[in-house]
């Protein structure tokens, strides 16, 4: 019988390797210090005693002592789980090999082949496509309509500007999961919206906002706009209020229209400042777990997918593979591929953005 648990063996093995690496580094630092002391003695200079070494550590290297505990925490709770997750992708740790009942084996890249070319490819690539479409749509809509709303609220002559801003900011103050659960009840087949539409005889039956794949995807994007637009509006408002008025006044004197001013002055300035935030929002939307999980739960169900629904993103599919299906190796592969996609896009987008190029030039 298998007494040992493979996952515990792997965790303790990785922890031992990390401990050995830390010990080797400390030992190397000790040898380096001993060599330095020997050089001092051979040159006839004074060798510091224990009290002097302690004062040097307490004064000149005090930051090293402060960083010891946080560094241990990072190693145990960030580095170790990350390496453990990567290692699982190269095993057959799934529902057929549950720990501690059975031991899993190292299988190389077979899990990657299963996801990219095997039975999981029919789920992975459609979900990857929808994830990218969702990330682009969610980022673009909140950015565009947030700027439009900021311009409207900063229009000259508009009364009660602070009141309007406060009303829109309320959606930020409300916890996101509360808003999503309320919208889920509001949009379901027997919710208030469908009830109102049928009472007014605008529809013969309930509109499947959350139960039809296409309707559900549009509903998710719309609800995300409700949550994300106020944040973009606040950021854009701060940028607009600090734009140099000389350029705008000069453009108005030259006869430029409001659209021309927006196109040539306002929008480029907003885009320059918000470019890093836009990239961050795009990556965040790729891994936006809350909106999908609380609004549709990944549904409606799709019989052609493995452990996934029509609106699942890669991150929510990863969650289902881990919690429901117990396919930890496949979930690890999805996590690695998602990270590779996000990291590649981030590097390319950041290095090619105007904000990065201006900072590098300075």
Language model region names:
Residues 1-20, 24-40, 62-362:
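A structural signal for multi-pass alpha-helical bundles of membrane permease subunits
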Residues 39-58:
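Membrane-interfacial, low-structure loops and terminal tails that flank and connect transmembrane helices
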């Amino acid at each position: 019988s298998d007494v040992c648990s493979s996952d515990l063996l792997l965790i303790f093995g990785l922890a031992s390797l990390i401990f050995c690496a830390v010990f080797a580094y400390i030992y190397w630092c000790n040898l380096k210090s001993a060599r330095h002391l020997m050089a001092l003695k051979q040159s006839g200079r004074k060798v510091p005693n224990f009290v002097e070494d302690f004062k040097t550590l307490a004064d000149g290297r005090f930051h090293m002592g402060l960083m010891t505990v946080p560094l241990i925490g990072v190693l145990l709770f960030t580095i170790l789980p990350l390496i453990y997750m990567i290692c699982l992708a190269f095993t057959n740790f799934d529902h057929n090999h549950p720990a501690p009942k059975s031991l899993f084996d190292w299988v190389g890249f077979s899990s990657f082949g299963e996801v990219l070319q095997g039975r999981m490819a029919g789920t992975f690539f459609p979900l990857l496509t929808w994830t990218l479409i969702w990330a682009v749509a969610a980022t673009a809509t909140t950015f565009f309509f947030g700027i439009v709303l900021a311009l409207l609220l900063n229009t000259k002559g508009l009364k009660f500007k602070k009141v309007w801003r406060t009303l829109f900011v309320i959606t930020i103050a409300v916890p996101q999961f509360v808003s999503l659960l309320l919208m889920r009840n509001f949009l379901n087949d027997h919710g208030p919206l469908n009830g109102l539409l049928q009472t007014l005889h605008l529809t013969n039956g309930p509109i499947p906002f959350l139960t039809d794949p296409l309707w559900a995807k549009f509903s998710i994007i719309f609800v995300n706009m409700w949550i994300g637009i106020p944040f973009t509006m606040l950021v854009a408002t701060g940028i607009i209020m600090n734009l140099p008025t000389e350029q705008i006044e000069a453009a108005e004197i030259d006869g430029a229209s409001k659209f021309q001013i927006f196109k040539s002055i306002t929008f480029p300035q907003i885009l320059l400042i918000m470019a890093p935030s836009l990239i961050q929002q795009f990556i965040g939307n790729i891994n936006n777990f809350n909106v999908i999980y609380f609004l549709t739960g990944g549904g409606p169900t799709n019989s052609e997918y493995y452990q996934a629904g029509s609106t699942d993103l890669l991150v929510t599919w990863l969650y289902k593979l881990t919690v429901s299906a117990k396919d930890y190796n496949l979930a690890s592969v999805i996590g690695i591929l998602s990270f590779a996609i996000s990291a590649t896009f981030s590097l390319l987008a950041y290095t090619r953005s105007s904000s990065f190029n201006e900072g590098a030039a300075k």
